[in-house]
Amino acid sequence: MVAWKDLERAEPEFAARARRLFDAGRHKTIATLRADGSPRISGIECEFAGGELTFGSMPGARKGADLRRDPRFALHGPAFHPQEGKEAEWPGEAKIAGRAVLAGPAGEEPAGDLFLADISEVVITRLNPEATLLVIESWTPPRGLRVVERE
């Protein structure tokens, strides 16, 4: 299992930027797979604690049922759009993909499921300093960090 602390050890600066982007707002978006294989998008909150990325699901929530059946997920941090004329100041956005590992009941009421993220990829999308190129930074455990620029 690849925990958040593994990314922090491998790429501390990249991990810190990704976490700042996730911590910039309370509400995130998670994509899960329905029983028929079609995608489901749901709002969610997550927490970075003890070197782990965790998130929960309330009792009876469809996203929790999705994750118990098929643990694959994609998590998108809060979205903030670049301001016109100030595009170079946009911090970007972060995404995390992986598998949700059921860790037991959530510690808060209402009781639900607590999941740990087994991370397969972390991506930061931003603009270059001149705001002329899209910069995609992605990290995977086997490959490490890669940076691609696009017009």
Where are these regions (language model features)?
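Short alpha-helical segments used as structural interaction elements across diverse proteins
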Residues: 14-16, 23-25, 37, 60, ...
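Short, structured beta-strand-loop surface elements
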Residues: 4-5, 59-122, 128-130
